[in-house]
Amino acid sequence: MCNKLFAGRRGYFLGFVASFGLVGLALFLQQKYNLEPCPLCISQRIAFMALGILFLLAALHNPGRVGRKVYGLLHVIAAATGIGIAARHIWIQANPDKVMAECGAGFDYIMETFPLKKALDLIFKGTGECSAIDWTLFGLTIPQLSLIAFVGLGLFAVLLAFHKKA
């Protein structure tokens, strides 16, 4: 069973579905609970989409032994980026007194108004809205759940990279 799951394109396609499924879940929660995503939330979604696109490219390419390792490295880099963003978001939520108390500018405004380097700096500093905890599942916040998902997808990518092709 596991061999078939990880064989060739199936494993990569599963990673693609999981990545974009998580983005879909985030959009569903946003609509259902009228949540306004902060810049770090949007950055995490972008990281999930990047990871998903890499999984889709690998599924379409169906790489050999060396290619699986290259894709594995790219997947791990994308997952590590997501882990870093989620970890920063968790820190901001745990230390709301260390960030701005008021809500800052939205993601779109920041990206349209500032040069890329300055925009990224502002996004990763976090804003007051990044410290808000609007929804939890089993006592875990959305960034904590995202961190778990990024770690899981990163480990899954490593497993795919070293799995023998059927």
Swiss-Prot record:
Pull the Periplasmic topological domain ranges from the record.
29-46, 88-144
**Where is it chiefly localized?**
membrane
Source superkingdom: Bacteria
Transmembrane as a keyword of this entry, yes or no, is yes
GO terms for biological process, alphabetical: protein folding
Q: Name one GO cellular component term.
A: plasma membrane
The disulfide bonds in this chain are: C38-C41, C103-C130
Instruction: Tell me where in or outside the cell this protein is found.
Output: Cell inner membrane
Q: Which Pfam families does the protein's record reference?
A: DsbB
Tell me the InterPro entries matching this sequence: DiS_bond_form_DsbB/BdbC, Disulphide_bond_form_DsbB, DsbB, DsbB-like_sf
Membrane side Cytoplasmic: residue ranges: 1-11, 64-69, 164-166
Record membrane topology: Multi-pass membrane protein
Claim: Transmembrane is one of the keywords in the record: yes
Where does the record place a coiled coil? none
Positions of transmembrane segments: 12-28, 47-63, 70-87, 145-163
Keywords, alphabetical: Cell inner membrane, Cell membrane, Chaperone, Disulfide bond, Electron transport, Membrane, Oxidoreductase, Redox-active center, Transmembrane, Transmembrane helix, Transport
Q: What does the record give under GO molecular function?
A: electron transfer activity; protein-disulfide reductase activity
Q: Which family does it belong to?
A: Belongs to the DsbB family.
The record describes the protein's role as: Required for disulfide bond formation in some periplasmic proteins. Acts by oxidizing the DsbA protein.
The name on file for this protein is Disulfide bond formation protein B
Q: Which organism is it from?
A: Methylobacillus flagellatus (strain ATCC 51484 / DSM 6875 / VKM B-1610 / KT)
- Lineage of the organism: Bacteria, Pseudomonadati, Pseudomonadota, Betaproteobacteria, Nitrosomonadales
